[in-house]
């Protein structure tokens, strides 16, 4: 890739139909983990006009009122009137949940957490870069900020005409591999009938864009596409069917890193799609925080029923202060990559997952997000002797 280029990432709001589905799946997971930390959960959700379907495989001693939980998530997200695409109080809720296959369970459940086997085969990636304060790529970082601001203004009532469904997209111009300015901002937001397109355009620029995007990244040539198709009244599940796991690039690094293909929401941490990806982020972030590299991608891969990974790879894209092979050896020494130890060390059996389902699983330094800690940075730096 040339050192001068444009790079784009997107984010979506919590009212986007796919994110509504993610929230429902993770809310169910959380409620189960509150009662049963040993539960096996793989929960998928589909939302469409007037209905929500929950399906999957769950083995647990917990009892959860699935229907009530689904309704609460939908209304809390802002869908409390049929005119918005779905009303959580009156929509149909269909439950098609079964139990985890015995064939899978026999390979995963080994008694002690230390011996826990991976819930499936798969490959996962973690990534970090020193472009932003949270060590996330710039385009996804600013896209998430735009969507969080949209939600804040909607919930506070400051822009009362906003509705839950929205998307943002940011294009960064890079020079010598460093982000220099924003070339294009795209933001589409659902709204009610009371607002004109000019009023909406001006309010989005003044109250959303200018409040979260640093002035130094905006130039006279920065292009804005605000609700570029015009009216956006029909949104949410009425506009598009929503499914769990369809926003995996929004959930991770906005396309700036590889993705193993596995979604996160609705899965307990024995599923390495989730826990392995969280560990990958933890490793990559600590490597960059330690100053071992400006940019780092980590790949891990697992076999179903096997505790240890089958492979580990580190790529610093030529920015490493020591070789990638040397960093790999340090990672193997400092981090325990057995599935059970990942769960234990990152404390992943807590009911924290609904918080992850919006605005990215990475880059928000919340107390619950243990994979965002940089507590191994000093250890890595000392071991690398840099």
Swiss-Prot record:
Cofactor: Mg(2+); K(+)
Chief location bin: cytoplasm
UniProt binding sites for Mg(2+): 18
Positions contributing to L-methionine binding: 57, 100, 240, 271
An example Gene Ontology biological process: one-carbon metabolic process
Metabolic or biological pathway, per its Swiss-Prot or TrEMBL entry: Amino-acid biosynthesis; S-adenosyl-L-methionine biosynthesis; S-adenosyl-L-methionine from L-methionine: step 1/1
Residue pairs linked by disulfide bridges in the UniProt entry: none
Region listing for Flexible loop, in residue ranges: 100-110
Cited PROSITE patterns: ADOMET_SYNTHASE_1, ADOMET_SYNTHASE_2
Molecular function as annotated in GO: ATP binding; magnesium ion binding; methionine adenosyltransferase activity
One term under GO cellular component: cytoplasm
Keywords, ordered alphabetically: ATP-binding, Cytoplasm, Magnesium, Metal-binding, Nucleotide-binding, One-carbon metabolism, Potassium, Transferase
Binding site for ATP: 16, 165-167, 240, 246-247, 263, 267
Location of this chain's protein in the cell: Cytoplasm
EC number(s) stated in the UniProt entry for this protein: 2.5.1.6
Domain of life: Bacteria
Reactions that this protein is recorded to catalyse: L-methionine + ATP + H2O = S-adenosyl-L-methionine + phosphate + diphosphate
Pfam families: S-AdoMet_synt_C, S-AdoMet_synt_M, S-AdoMet_synt_N
Binding-site positions, K(+): 44
Co-factor remark: Binds 2 divalent ions per subunit.
Function according to Swiss-Prot or TrEMBL: Catalyzes the formation of S-adenosylmethionine (AdoMet) from methionine and ATP. The overall synthetic reaction is composed of two sequential steps, AdoMet formation and the subsequent tripolyphosphate hydrolysis which occurs prior to release of AdoMet from the enzyme.
Subunit structure: Homotetramer; dimer of dimers.
UniProt family annotation: Belongs to the AdoMet synthase family.
Protein name: S-adenosylmethionine synthase
């Amino acid at each position: 890739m040339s050192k001068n280029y444009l790079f784009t990432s997107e984010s979506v709001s919590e009212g986007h139909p796919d994110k509504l589905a993610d929230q429902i799946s993770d809310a169910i997971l959380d409620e189960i983990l509150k009662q049963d930390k040993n539960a096996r959960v793989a929960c998928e959700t589909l939302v469409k006009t007037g209905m929500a379907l929950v399906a999957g495989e769950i083995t647990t001693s917990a009892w959860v009122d699935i229907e009530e939980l689904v309704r609460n998530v939908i209304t809390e997200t802002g869908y409390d009137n049929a005119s918005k695409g779905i009303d959580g109080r009156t929509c149909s809720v269909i439950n098609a949940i079964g139990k985890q296959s015995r064939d899978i369970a026999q390979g995963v459940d080994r008694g002690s957490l230390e011996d826990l086997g991976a819930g499936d085969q798969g490959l996962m990636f973690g990534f970090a870069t020193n472009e932003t304060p949270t060590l996330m790529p710039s385009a996804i970082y600013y896209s998430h900020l735009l969507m969080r601001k949209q939600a804040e203004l909607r919930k506070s009532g400051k822009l009362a005409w906003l509705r839950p469904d929205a998307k943002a997209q940011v294009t960064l111009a890079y020079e010598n591999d460093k982000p220099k300015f924003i070339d294009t901002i795209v933001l589409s937001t659902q709204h009610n009938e009371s607002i004109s397109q000019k009023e909406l355009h001006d309010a989005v620029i003044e109250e959303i864009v200018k409040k979260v995007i640093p002035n130094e990244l905006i130039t006279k040539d920065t292009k804005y596409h605000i609700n570029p198709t015009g009216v956006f009244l029909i949104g949410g599940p009425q506009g598009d069917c929503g499914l769990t796991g369809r926003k995996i690039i929004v959930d991770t690094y906005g396309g700036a890193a590889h993705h193993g293909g596995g979604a996160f929401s609705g899965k307990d941490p024995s599923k390495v799609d989730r826990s392995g990806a969280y560990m990958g982020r933890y490793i990559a972030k600590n490597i960059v925080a330690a100053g071992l590299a400006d940019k780092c991608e980590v790949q891990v891969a697992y076999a179903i029923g096997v505790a240890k990974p089958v492979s580990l790879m580190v790529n610093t894209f030529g920015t490493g202060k020591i070789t990638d092979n040397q960093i790999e050896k340090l990672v193997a020494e400092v981090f325990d990559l057995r599935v059970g130890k990942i769960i234990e060390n990152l404390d992943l059996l807590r009911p924290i997952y609904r918080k992850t389902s919006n605005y990215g699983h990475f880059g928000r330094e919340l107390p619950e997000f243990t994979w965002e800690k940089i507590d191994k940075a000093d250890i890595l730096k000392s071991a690398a002797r840099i």
